[in-house]
From Swiss-Prot:
Chain coiled-coil ranges: none
The species this protein was found in: Geobacter metallireducens (strain ATCC 53774 / DSM 7210 / GS-15)
Chief localisation class: cytoplasm
UniProt-recorded name of the protein: Translation initiation factor IF-1
Localization: Cytoplasm
Amino acid sequence: MSKEEAIEVEGTVIEPLPNAMFRVELENGHVVLAHISGKMRKYFIKILPGDKVTVELSPYDLSRGRITYRAK
């Protein structure tokens, strides 16, 4: 378990990158590098450019995150 809670923010996928990584623009204008969470990878959730997603950011490195949800 992590000592610090993750920061959840909304964003939009800008571009897909290799190895299930994505460049995501957050609501506040910042651009982060995000990978897909394990459950999304397991159930083959497809993410395309333009999709609205929820990203968890670590308080230690705000430039990287994990995509935990794709809005319908």
